[in-house]
């Protein structure tokens, strides 16, 4: 399959730079997987689409202020984007500089350059950096870091983004990008879902900056997926198995929840799904056999991205590309701060190719 099979024309004006005033007031495009039928509505319609006993699986990662500015002690500006926190002192990061720092180089970070750090080693495209500070990494980032808005949100981060680019249920700091499908759920909607009898479970996948990396090969089978850390604890496994046993659906909120659950299913030897605490490089594209997910809540993704491939593997290629065409015609808002989709599984998708 060619990467270009997943291209579509998107007017710049449809890229959302700010979220809706109310989280749950965005538009919702529903795609019926088996038939391809589309219905238009608002996000709160999700209440009517879920049945008592259905299981919603959320990603409870929390975005860290992962973008740092500063300079090398030897001169030259740098921009640091944390990929992951290794421990209380060390990070793995992308560093933009006119000349990459060498091992042992001292970095001065923050607007006042008050935070000192040392570049320890290079691991491919990533740099291992150690902070020379008493405070733990997370405290330093909260003090001097900027929210790492995606590259297509073409504006500086604002104080409001610290709340807006964050789900209301995120409790596990470590992501450098929000699991954006979850941004649409506010407390009143969560309360109504609970009152209806919808079950909820939480996985953790710390979204890395690699999620924004373009696919740089022509044939998608040759693409190597970036690695991200995911946790699917025993209580999630139990909740999934219980939902299936009573004939209910497992609904993933966001592609990161999909990738967490499907990674746990792949790792399970003789069960549908087993606990998973590891890095995952799962790459889902047409031809993939879904194990766990029955429905999906997700935002609109970038052309030629691994995420539109994941959706195509779930709903079917033709149904997905048609839904995106209609979304553009109907002026839905795209990407992280944009509108959402509710998609049910298409059992025929596995045999469909572009």
Swiss-Prot record:
Give EC number(s), comma-separated. 2.4.99.17
Enzyme class (EC, first level):
transferase
Q: List all membrane-crossing ranges.
A: none
Q: What are the entry keywords?
A: Cytoplasm, Queuosine biosynthesis, S-adenosyl-L-methionine, Transferase
A GO cellular component entry from the record: cytoplasm
Q: How does it assemble?
A: Monomer.
Function noted in UniProt: Transfers and isomerizes the ribose moiety from AdoMet to the 7-aminomethyl group of 7-deazaguanine (preQ1-tRNA) to give epoxyqueuosine (oQ-tRNA).
What is the name listed in the Swiss-Prot or TrEMBL entry for this protein? S-adenosylmethionine:tRNA ribosyltransferase-isomerase
Which organism was this protein described from? Klebsiella pneumoniae subsp. pneumoniae (strain ATCC 700721 / MGH 78578)
Q: Which gene encodes it?
A: queA
């Amino acid at each position: 399959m060619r990467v270009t099979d997943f291209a579509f024309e998107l007017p710049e004006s449809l890229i959302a730079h700010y979220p809706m005033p109310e989280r749950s007031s965005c538009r919702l495009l529903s795609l019926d997987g088996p038939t391809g039928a589309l219905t238009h509505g608002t996000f709160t319609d999700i209440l009517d689409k879920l049945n008592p006993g259905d299981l919603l699986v959320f990603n409870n990662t929390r975005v860290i202020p992962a973008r740092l500015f500063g300079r090398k002690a030897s001169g030259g500006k740098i921009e640091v984007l944390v990929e992951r926190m290794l421990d209380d002192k060390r990070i793995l990061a992308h560093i933009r500089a006119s000349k990459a720092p060498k091992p042992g180089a001292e970095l001065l970070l923050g607007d006042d350059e008050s935070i000192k750090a040392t570049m320890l080693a290079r691991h491919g495209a990533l740099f291992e950096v150690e902070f020379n500070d008493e405070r733990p990494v997370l405290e330093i980032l909260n003090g001097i870091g900027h929210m790492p808005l995606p590259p297509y949100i073409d504006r500086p981060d604002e104080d409001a983004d610290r709340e807006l680019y964050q789900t209301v249920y995120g409790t596990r700091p470590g992501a450098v990008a929000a699991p954006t499908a979850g941004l649409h759920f506010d407390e009143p909607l969560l309360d109504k879902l609970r009152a209806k009898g919808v079950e909820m479970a939480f996985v953790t996948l710390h979204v890395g900056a690699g999620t924004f990396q373009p696919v740089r090969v022509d044939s998608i089978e040759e693409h190597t997926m970036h690695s991200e850390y995911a946790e699917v604890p025993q209580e999630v496994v139990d909740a999934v198995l219980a939902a299936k046993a009573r004939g209910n659906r497992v609904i993933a909120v966001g592609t990161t929840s999909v990738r967490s659950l499907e990674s746990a299913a792949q790792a399970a030897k003789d069960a549908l799904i087993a606990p998973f605490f590891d890095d995952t490089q799962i790459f889902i594209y047409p031809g993939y056999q879904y194990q766990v997910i029955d429905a999906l809540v997700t935002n609109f993704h970038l052309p030629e991205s691994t995420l539109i491939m994941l959706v195509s593997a779930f709903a079917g290629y033709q149904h997905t590309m048609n839904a995106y065409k209609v979304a553009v015609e109907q002026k839905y808002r795209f990407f992280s701060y944009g509108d959402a989709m509710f998609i049910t599984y298409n059992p025929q998708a596995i045999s469909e190719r572009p």
